Amino acid sequence: MALVSVAPMASRSCLHKSLSSSAHELKTICRTIPTLGMSRRGKSATPSMSMSLTTTVSDDGVQRRMGDFHSNLWNDDFIQSLSTSYGEPSYRERAERLIGEVKKMFNSMSSEDGELISPHNDLIQRVWMVDSVERLGIERHFKNEIKSALDYVYSYWSEKGIGCGRESVVADLNSTALGFRTLRLHGYAVSADVLNLFKDQNGQFACSPSQTEEEIRSVLNLYRASLIAFPGEKVMEEAEIFSAKYLEESLQKISVSSLSQEIRDVLEYGWHTYLPRMEARNHIDVFGQDTQNSKSCINTEKLLELAKLEFNIFHSLQKRELEYLVRWWKDSGSPQMTFCRHRHVEYYTLASCIAFEPQHSGFRLGFAKACHIITILDDMYDTFGTVDELELFTAAMKRWDPSAADCLPEYMKGVYLILYDTVNETSREAEKAQGRDTLDYARRAWDDYLDSYMQEAKWIATGYLPTFAEYYENGKVSSGHRTSALQPILTMDIPFPPHILKEVDFPSKLNDLASAILRLRGDTRCYKADRARGEEASSISCYMKDNPGATEEDALDHINAMISDVIRGLNWELLNPNSSVPISSKKHVFDISRAFHYGYKYRDGYSVANIETKSLVRRTVIDPVTL
């Protein structure tokens, strides 16, 4: 029922005993629960490739439900066989030289007597340059230059938008749409009302019958801008509908080219599921083929070479991190947990697609570990464990003492220890980054998370179908967004003092909305499979219960409308120009939401690693780009 957040739930003792019970008391209780004869070490079994539910009788005679998920697709031998030469110093040295040359391009644009620009193109050149380095995944090297360029553009921004240059007589759609999008993404206060200026006398966005390449590119940037909508911005919704239709029609008319591929990519992934490293990989292909780029007075060949080098240099780091992650997975005893899914490589891929700065290794590995543990817990609480066992496990985890594991069924001991060890380990990493101990904070998040799972396990066991409100509030917790995000972001070189942390973690609106979208989107992709496994409660079924006569289609329409509203709310929480919290402090929580959203874009990409999931792993982690 859950995938991989958490808001406080009412405190309750699942054992109807004080959580301060001694280890002796817990051992007395646990004697009534037999073990399964499973150990933490040994060779992994290979589950079926299907997603059906099976039942199995353990050696203690307990009949258990078990999801028949496929096994880990990326075995140790395969990971160890990966090779790369891009970790050699010569590649880093070449990249550093190119970084210096690109900085000179930025600086030349800022010079009064610069050769690259004129008063007739100085605005679009700056915006295009910023947009290009961001889409190519190399913006981290040019933060000061980007700010300087956008400050300049914003100084000429007006309620009528901008033209190509500061001396342009009228604003044009391409410059205004791309400028609006880029400025908004960087926290500048720009109103969507500026787009109304590009409507005709009938209130419709105007276009020509011929659909020239220049116009198509302008509408493409209008579409990209429309996806960064805030709540209540009707013109952005209108722009999205118009531009999506226009671009789909244009694909039927233009020849196969870099432009057509760029349109397909943007229509396919939008913004909320277009993960930065995936976009960089795709844009490298498009950027290298785009003949329009060669007309620019900016040296695009150097931009492209730098993007390729940076992609491959990070690829060499990914190989080392993957090798470490696979060793951790094996040493933790995870392969012996045959009742659950093993998607640690896929989770690492998502992390490396949203945080590919070399120094954020702790974030990538911490996220992959947390999500792996969450998936184990999901399968244990939803299918494999009995209610009595799960109550015992929940109470034992709240004691946060390794001796509490002694009273657990054998298969639960491994789960307890991997959670206990990993949370403690990540807390030590977070303490180095934040300068304070955050373990108690993390423990409370995990306690609330397990309480939400326990609630769902009882619903399954009793066949209770909650109201939508009951389900939704608990489901935002059990979605796992908070527990997957909290500790990993604390390992980063971004300060999270308490007053900032409360604005990105619980009880912030950002955390609530990010958790909501994971719960709602997950339900739209999983509810049928969950129902087949005996997990009736979902936002779809609960909505239908609350609204007698409503069909599944009605429920899905309602949930999808909620998702659209949540997305706009998330945009606002991230980009609100009046917020006291820097975008950099919120961005990774927001991007984790995007990563999970991508996993559910087509179907449940976590239970079954579909073609799109495997392609993402290969294109962003396994295969380098050709220089």
Swiss-Prot record:
Provide this UniProt record's keywords sorted from A to Z: Chloroplast, Lyase, Magnesium, Manganese, Metal-binding, Plastid, Transit peptide
- Its protein name is (-)-alpha-pinene synthase 2, chloroplastic
Tell me the domain comment.
Answer: The Asp-Asp-Xaa-Xaa-Asp/Glu (DDXXD/E) motif is important for the catalytic activity, presumably through binding to Mg(2+).
Q: Where does Mg(2+) 3 bind?
A: 530
- Known cofactor(s): Mg(2+); Mn(2+)
What function does the entry list? Answer: Involved in defensive oleoresin formation in conifers in response to insect attack or other injury. Involved in monoterpene (C10) olefins biosynthesis. A mixture of alpha- and beta-pinene (35:10) is produced by this enzyme.
Q: Which one GO biological process term can you cite for this protein?
A: diterpenoid biosynthetic process
What is this protein's expression induced by? By wounding and insect attack.
Residues annotated as transmembrane = none
Residues holding Mg(2+) 1: 378, 382
Q: Does the keyword Transit peptide apply?
A: yes
MF terms in GO: lyase activity; magnesium ion binding; pinene synthase activity
Its cellular-component GO annotations read:
chloroplast
Q: Which domain of life is it from?
A: Eukaryota
Q: Where is this motif: DDXXD motif?
A: 378-382
Positions annotated to bind Mg(2+) 2: 378, 382
Its chief place of residence is: plastid
Q: In which pathway does it act?
A: Terpene metabolism; oleoresin biosynthesis
Q: Gene3D superfamilies, from UniProt?
A: Farnesyl Diphosphate Synthase, Terpene synthase, N-terminal domain
